Amino acid sequence: DRSPSRGLGDVYKRQVYIIETKHEKDTNALETVRTLFANKTRDFITAVDEKSIILVKEVKGNESYDELDKTADVIIDMLSTEAMSAAHVAYGTIVNDIREVSRSYKEAKMALDVGKIFYSNKNVVAYNRLGIGRLIYQLPIPLCQMFIKEIFEGKAPDDFDDETLSTINKFFENSLNVSETSRQLYIHRNTLVYRLDKLQKSTGLDLRVFDDAITFKIALMVVKYMKYMESKDTF
């Protein structure tokens, strides 16, 4: 019976990674991770459920979060090549005390969830870099519903057609730059202006105005969060 606290002295900094594999009961993945850290006697690795592996890793005094990112990248690369397994890795903050390891684990778990909702294109998600996604994740659902109702007066942002949504997302990606957005969408500048005007008429929000853009961006994230929570409740 190996528990995370056994054999882990109190003088080392640590931090928790959660590695979630695409397939359930992926024994190859667990073995690959164990092999990767085989010579690290102070690191602890275990499978917690069908798809998740936990790595409690010793952190050297001078190791930065950038280096922890690199470790996560190495894990993903190894799983991809050695175990033929796609994975997501999330990690918590560095803790100074063995009693705080559970906090780093909870942070990693939250990072995994927040990553699925808002940053699905990222394979590595760090708790301390979750940004606004972490804030939204901690909002009560009734508050989210009220916010969406107030902003859109009954018309949810995901009711927009694909063309409108891709225009909005591209506009945000390009920091509200009309010329660059129209170039990347292969449309005339006037076409983009027309779409933004149309959106303004239907929502009352002008995405060319910074405050309105922020409101809209947050609203889209809130809707993503609500949908994710809904899908969790249906299982």
Question: What do the PLM-derived regions correspond to, one by one?
Answer:
Residues 1-12:
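Single conserved hydrophobic/aromatic residue that forms the stacking wall/gate
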Residues 10-235:
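Cytosolic nucleotide-utilizing catalytic cores of signal-transduction proteins
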